[in-house]
């Protein structure tokens, strides 16, 4: 099966939202099947209901196991037998449960290596997320990559949630993802300040964390006040930006990427992407949902799979070194951005 296309698992999301619409519309373009082989984790009955109600032409083949997936067609894996009542635009316990069942089955198959990458359909965010999540959420577009140090925290709790250790940990994840997933040889990361005016957290936590990253040969710069940083388009000088909390990263991201965006979970073994929007209940069932973000999430996952393969193969069979590598310091002078140790002098 060396010549088979990349297997892309796609969970159907909340069944009362736009999940099925954007998934099926994404594969109305036959060229998508030239790039990958989709395995939709969901409900054949729910998919059929959405396809007919929204007059979508995409056909799919029902399978019971991921091993049955075939290239050149849209494969729909039945993850549960019970019928799910569809109520467009209304979040219900049944629709949320259906979304969770699809994710649970996809995770099981992930452990069995039955597909290559995972794309999560749009769901309602968990109101009680895992605060100890070691992964890093990265928001991607053609213009910017923004990592979020913390997720779904009230602003008053953010200061207590940040630490030198967490910034170093997430900074390393970001750095490694930029190298392996995006094939950037020596990525530069900007770290944002927590406060509009640099203060205690910046001096005692963020700046020391940046210095520690520098000691580990990671090009980290900052801390930068977020509003001024984006207003001056300083993000264009970096390969990634690490924000301290959701809104600090999401607001400028939405401004810089109004058409579409993709979210990536970095720091986990699997390649996992999702859309930058939720179930969009307000437009569900109207046939006007835009599949661009879902399509871009698939593109990103496929590209990452290829990049990781290209990155990992030489490491598996390395050639003997005939020279001594010297870290390039040119970027420091070329961009003339202040270092953390210089800001608080």
Explain the meaning of each model-derived region.
Residues 1-345:
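Anion-binding alpha/beta catalytic cores of soluble intermediary-metabolism enzymes, centered on
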